[in-house]
Amino acid sequence: SNRRGVVNNINVGMVEKVEVITNPSAKYDPDGVGGIINIVMKRGALDGFNGTISGMTGEYENRNLNSNINYRSEKWNLFGGASTRSGNNIGKGYRNFTYQYAERDSSLFQNTLRIKNPANIGVRLGGDYYPNSNSSISYTYAYGDHEETTKENLEITSPPSRIIESESADIGKHHDHSVSYENKFGTTDRKLTASLDLNLEEDEVTQSNFENSSLIDDLNTNQDTDFNEKNNSITFSIDYEDQINEKISVETGFKTNLKSFSTDYNYLQQLYNNKYDEDIYAAYTSFTYDITDRFGIKAGARFEKVETKASLDSSPENDLNPDSSNIISAIINNAVGESPYINPYSKVYPSVFLIYKLSSMQTIQLGYSKKVNRPGRRTISPFPRNTFDISRIRNGNPYLNPEYADVAEMKFSSNARKLNVNAGISYKLVKDNIMWWDRDMFEYEGKV
């Protein structure tokens, strides 16, 4: 599921528990150089009708209201929930930029005031059907609606002094559908699961900028920026677990994830379109072997074939009104000239874990796994999200390659009746780092 569309609209009252896996095995996606957070939602465990309602209020007009209802019988478990959240976020900042050139040095001083007013609505409906005691079929639908208005005031105090005001509105919604099947074959040693997820998200942003400069009295300029984002994905997976005997168990499965991200961008009445497709086909296998009563090993590998394509187009009408003197237009036009970018690649992600039991309540674990950090939509979008401050333009690169990491970890855990202790140390080696590149000059058509 899309992280923003799902996580940002989850109310704490809908959460059953949160599981943290610091160094996951080959069964899990290798995305991200950290661990995995698995959010388990409430589905209801008591027979009959059950429900809860909760609310909260706080500073800066922060409020949220959450409700859950559930009906459970021998064959069915039906559940639903709704939540709303609103509030104000206020931030202030100060920046001092110093630019050092061969001929001279220059400084830029900025004072920023930002006020955000986010509002979110979430609805979740679903149910479980139990054909028999060994299997279940589940469906969940989640809807989220968010609206955020932002007012930003930027005062540049170094000469020439300027005051820039920006007003923006971010309106979006997402629809998430999830179907899953589970079969335990009448035993605790085998399990087959299959799932299909469809996620649709749309985001629409408008931004208006107003500037007053001391260069010309009462100069008031206006620049408008609009963009529409669509972020869709389809995910299908099958996983099978089998405990062959008391010492050996295996896991295997495959997963397909098809993602599509597109942006229609309107800057100064110049139209652009950015589209990014990423298709991932994965298969994995892993095994666990208890060599002795104290010592065991879990090892596996995950193979992924990835196909990515980034394309950036400009409207034919843009050529009628070229604006090569505008730095933002020049940045976008440079990226258009490099389109399209196709990058198919394959990779194997191994993992191995050694576990030693010091006692029945104390264990030591050594682990290694390879990770990948694929570019996110903010890092691949060539369009600056804020266009009102040209002294600090931030835009992504649609032609980025992923970065890889080798992660090693050692953990100690002690679980006693009155005291639990968990400690660990990890080492991470990142290659082909994705990082923001800061520069104070730009080249366009051979000119700096």
Functional labels for PLM-detected ranges:
Residues 55-61, 73, 84-88, 143-149, ...:
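Transmembrane beta-strands of outer-membrane beta-barrel pores
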Residues 91-104, 150-158, 204-213, 217, ...:
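Outer-membrane beta-barrel translocator domains and adjoining extracellular loop/strand segments
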Residues 2-22:
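Short acidic/polar hinge/loop motifs at secondary-structure boundaries
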Residues 52-54, 104, 108-113, 160-167, ...:
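Extracellular loop and loop/strand-boundary signature of outer-membrane beta-barrel proteins
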Residues 4-6, 20, 32-53, 65:
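N-terminal periplasmic accessory domains that precede
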Residues 61-88, 104-151, 172-177, 183:
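Transmembrane beta-barrel wall of Gram-negative outer-membrane proteins
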Residues 229, 272, 276, 340-343, ...:
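Outer-membrane beta-barrel signature, preferentially recognizing the C-terminal barrel domain
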